[in-house]
A protein has these predicted regions:
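Sequence/structural signature of beta-propeller domains
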Residues: 1-329
Length: 329
């Protein structure tokens, strides 16, 4: 499939992901490198791949006679410590949180559990964090660390340059899904499915500190072909479940040969993939924003898609964007 033949859409800017400098460990007025997005009620949760904090942003409210405006967010610490300020040193030390998903509550009454996952692209990027939400969808303060080593190890036999960039739960809550992002050295992106009940049991044990239990093995691995932009393969950056086994994806065409180094983003796309792994709808995004997080809501028989971007430069703020996709019904 050549995405040059697909629709072109211009995203609408919702706003930049701004924070108070006094709250940011580096004194920045924004969150950069946004890489995962989850909506819970009227809150947006955002992970960034070069931070130790989670960004929390409230849905813009409509003021009479004025357009909606995204207000400054707050930061919630995921991991202790401080990352180096130097770009090279920071890249080497960061846990690389590339994925964020919402899981069902593990027992206590709550709006669910957020799960941030490291990419697995380096040994120090194999940590996950579980964050419990209260019944209102706010972070409750309870969290647990997850060692992803045994979850990722079998995947390296198929993907030597593993790079987990997306994660979601199927609508019927039977499957836990990871998305591997390819690169120009190995352009294969993949949808990796697990039995949710097995993963759920493993995560509960991890949360209880039982680190000796090995993670479940994937039940299927689908190679996903997304096409090319100017000769550069599009690769998955995130996904979210839709009805009927379908799922929506975000993707970028980045000129890099591996999972660690950044490259020029020559194109970006969003679309819908069916249960068989076939792309049944896709559109390229005008302006080539490097979209790395996606959330979807059904509105007026259409899909309202919210995206966050990674500018690959800490001096620039990540952006929240919106587009609308047609419903498949």
């Amino acid at each position: 499939m050549k995405l040059a033949d697909a629709n072109n859409l211009r995203p609408t800017l919702v706003g930049e992901l701004l924070v108070k400098p006094k709250d940011h460990p580096s004194g920045l007025s924004h969150l950069s490198a946004a890489s995962g997005l989850v909506r819970v009620g009227k809150r947006w949760y955002v992970v960034a791949d070069d931070e130790l904090h989670l960004g929390v942003f409230k849905e813009p409210s409509q003021v009479t006679g004025k357009s909606k405006k995204l207000k400054k967010g707050t930061l919630y610490r995921l991991l202790d410590g401080t990352l180096p300020s130097g770009k090279k040193q920071r890249k080497a030390a960061k846990p690389d949180f590339e994925s964020l998903m919402l899981l069902p509550a593990f027992g206590s009454p709550s709006a669910g559990v957020l799960f941030a996952l490291g990419s697995g692209s380096k040994p120090n990027r194999q940590i996950g964090v579980l964050l419990e939400l209260d019944h209102r969808g706010k972070v409750s303060g309870r969290k647990a660390l997850v060692d992803l080593t045994t979850l990722y190890a079998p995947l390296r036999k198929q993907f030597a340059d593993l790079n987990i960039e997306g994660a979601f739960l199927s609508i019927d809550e039977t499957e836990f899904v990871l998305l591997h992002r390819g690169n120009q050295g190995d352009a294969r992106s993949a949808c990796i499915r697990y039995d949710w009940s097995a993963i759920n049991h493993w995560l509960i044990e991890q949360g209880q500190g039982k680190r000796t239990t090995r993670a479940p093995i994937a039940k299927s691995v689908q190679i996903i072909q997304l096409g090319y932009v100017d000769g550069i393969a599009l690769s998955l950056t995130d996904g979210i479940a839709l009805d009927g086994g379908h799922w929506a994806f975000s993707a970028v065409a980045e000129a890099t040969m591996d999972s660690v180094q950044d490259g020029t983003c020559v194109g970006s796309a969003v679309g819908i993939i069916n249960r068989l792994g076939d792309v049944i709808y896709s559109c390229t995004l005008l302006g080539n924003p490097k979209v790395e997080g996606i959330s979807v809501e059904s509105k007026n028989n259409q899909w309202e898609v919210t995206l966050v971007t990674d500018p690959d430069n800490a001096e620039y703020a990540s952006q929240m964007l919106k587009i609308t996709l047609p419903s498949l019904h």
